[in-house]
Amino acid sequence: MLEKNPASTAPAADGSAQPSAATPDATTDPHLVAPGSADSAVARGERPTVDAIATITEYLDRSDWRVNANANQGYSLGGMMLNTSGKVVANYWLSQVYPAVAGQAHRDADLHIHDLDMFAGYCAGWSLKDLLQQGFNGVPGAIAAGPAKHFSSAVGQIVNFLGTLQNEWAGAQAFSSFDTYMAPFVRLDDMTYAQVKQCMQELIFNLNVPSRWGTQTPFTNLTFDWTCPADLADEHPLIGDEVCDFAYGDLQAEMDLINRAFMEVMTEGDAEGRVFTFPIPTYNITRDFDWDAPNTELLFTMTAKYGLPYFQNFINSELDPGMIRSMCCRLQLDLRELLKRGNGLFGSAEQTGSVGVVTINMARLGYLYADDEAALTARLDELLEIGRDTLELKRTVIQHHIDAGLFPFTKRYLGTLDNHFSTLGVNGMNEMVRNFTHDAYDLTDPRGHAMCVRLLDHVRDKMVEFQEATGHLYNLEATPAEGTTYRFAKEDRKRYPGILQAGTESNPYYTNSSQVPVGYTDDPFEAQEMQEELQTKYTGGTVLHLYMNERISSAAACKELVRRSLTAFRTPYITITPTFSICPVHGYLVGEHLTCDKCAELHPEAEPVECEVWTRVMGYFRPVRSFNIGKKGEYAERQMFTEVAAGGHGPAVSRLSAVSA
């Protein structure tokens, strides 16, 4: 195991050096620090420090780019409190828990240890079935609610559960099979459609309130089955401690009401026409998906306008939808096998998720080891092993504190991290190829593409080694890297002025994971042909966002785009991501509008009325003005996909099979 030593300066929440002044307390537990702690800063009486004055001032005047690192966290008192406490927590992780080599690798931006500002695990998928059957209770000193007996009380418990558990985790909280598990309440309460829709409004509005630490909205994901899964079809629901005289498979009409109500509320948006950022809905598209069902029109009307859903590909997939619920059983399989999670990036499989994430700066490796793939791979292995060590330590620390009661609701509803993955990811593979080849070609060239495939396969092999060595689950994720992509580029520019990057001098960034350059094509099928093989290499979550220049013209056109994509390609996850704008007077506007043309026509003498331009920052929609510096640079360079280009593509042909659509 690697030895840990003190750092001379204190890191901020992202680990970069900060001035010194105030001293946070750090006590040593010999079970929770790396071997070698006798040589640590604490043991020698040296303690990491944070400059309290500078920390508050940088936030108040927004001079620190990290104020906008996360587009879900607005400038606010809560944001200031989280930013301030985050620096203290990051100091604890880097100087008290992790070995010195890991802390230095993070500070130097060789890799990025995510969520250092939060003393918590990454993301978690929960069992909605357990919550509904057991109620929201079991924590000493906290209000206890028994199993819900009605739809409205179930909605209340779901909101309370997700909001509460979000405060014990850094990332997304998810429920799967939402429509299946909620359908019995509709029948038992003999609900009308209007009543179901009212409950859906309460659910959605309440899940979009900034109630999370840092004045953030809880990051939530709901997976919808659409039709009852075979493994639940004959099971009789247990509602209010009583077994129902019907099975889940008898409730398709009730499931349809729930799906219809959810989609109508999401499509309507809020009172000013804004999109609901959460919950992110995921739909499992299977081979028997009914593309002509009445609700399908609503699904693609919603998608064409706001682009909200994630579509999980079970048409060309190694997974069965039932694995989303049975994943906790599947995880007992041979650790020599790399397991695919039933989710994109948000832990949507039941009772599993991710303990933590470490992302490797691939662009730097391409620059430092140009023309020498063997040396690049050797250094990649070193960084992956550092990542492994940090994730093993984090697992030990968080599990210890779950047992000790620091995370009371996680202890009640999860208990163990045994079924949670340790996640490693990559960033900037396109720039890696460019630097490795002195800009002779990039990832879109067959040679660059092949290099990326080789390296991703190599990382997968390392995951198997790590699983066998540790007994813990590992996976490879196309990490969202919302702030990391800019941080890597910013740090590399300081250290290596000649390194090739995307963006501009003031807005540099690296292309996410192994994605094609954002300006590569306006044809979504060309992008998928290029991305398919790379996308299938990820075992811990990946998604291909089809960024459209504007609202898709019709539900039928949107449906055809999704159908062709999922039928032709093995890409695990896709989204349709239209660009739209919100005028404070006229609401939703199609496409990008910095100012409102309608307002200008009505009042030509008045000052232009500014609009919010919305698109997906990574996994979720936010106004472009809330993006961090790097993401603004990416948005400026992005060539949006168009319906015209998609329509002129011809048959979409997979490189991995003879399938076409």
For each of these PLM feature ranges, what is it?
Residues E3-A10, E392, G619, P623:
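Non-catalytic alpha-helical coupling and interface elements of nucleotide-dependent molecular machines
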Residues M1-T28, S37:
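Mature N-terminal, pre-catalytic/accessory segment of carbohydrate-active enzymes
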Residues H420, L424-V433:
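Extended amphipathic alpha-helical segments enriched in small hydrophobics
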Residues L2-P6, T416, A636-Q639:
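Charged, amphipathic alpha-helical regulatory modules used
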Residues S581-A661:
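Intrinsic, low-complexity terminal and presequence regions
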